[in-house]
Amino acid sequence: MTFKDKVYIVTGASSGMGREFVKQVSKKEKFDEIWVIARRKEALESLKKEVKAKIRPITLDLQNPEGFDTYKKLLAEEKPEVALLANIAGYGKFGKYDEISLEDCRGMIDLNCKALVAMSQLTIPYMKRGSKILQLDSLSAFQPVPYLNVYGSSKSFVLSYSRALNRELKTKGIRVMSVNPGWVKTEFFDHATKSSNDAITYFNVMYDAKDVIKTAIRDLYHTKKDVSIHGFQIKAQVLLVKLLPHKIVMEIWMRQQKHK
């Protein structure tokens, strides 16, 4: 296949981590265009005023299967060389199991897992040696987390999928890295905790999206890591989770949240 323009593709680019990623990554290596994908057209359009790079807003609902038909056709028509795919779109609802609707449960799986896989599968054929895939994951991927049971499980899937895919694509010279932050103050966080009532009340440390993204980009371009973790406390927590039985880890979490 003969490729045309060299592009970056970023999902979830309308706000939070995705928007911050676009701002920072636009200053990296030379490329022709950044395709920014999200549902809110106005928010995507406004990125043009904040980023000097050429931006192409693409309004898609990644929870709707028809969105992938549109994306597939766009790739076939444009035939871009995709130097970077950043799957940052995500959906979370935190709280007690009976306070989260079935619609939200299915929505988390659809966007966090199914959409991420679909974007990866459709995009890889347009990548060359040296291309990269970044998957926004979560600290919750490393352990079972009560009151984040569906969200955390969806992120465990992302971690396993990303690491396995990274190994598969090694011979093609395509890199896959998951980014596993702790608590980050964003619009996503506000939405996820909005209906959690008293289920989650303790947040040990809150990070800034700018710092998490800065670390992620550094790790993506200057290391061979398949997992990026920002912050000493989060790195220590990941190590602890690996050393202790998950039953004990869950008990510690429950006590932190003041649940029996």
Please annotate each region the language model reported.
Residues 14-15:
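Conserved glycine-rich cofactor-binding loop
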Residues 88-93:
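Conserved NAD(P)H cofactor-binding loop of Rossmann-fold oxidoreductase domains
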Residues 96-97, 104-106:
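Substrate-binding pocket helix/loop in short-chain dehydrogenase/reductase
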Residues 120, 154:
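Active-site helix of classical SDR
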Residues 171-232:
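SDR active-site lid
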Residues 138:
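Residue(s) in the substrate-gating loop at a strand-loop-helix junction
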Residues 30-46:
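Conserved glycine-rich Rossmann-like NAD(P)H-binding loop of the short-chain dehydrogenase/reductase
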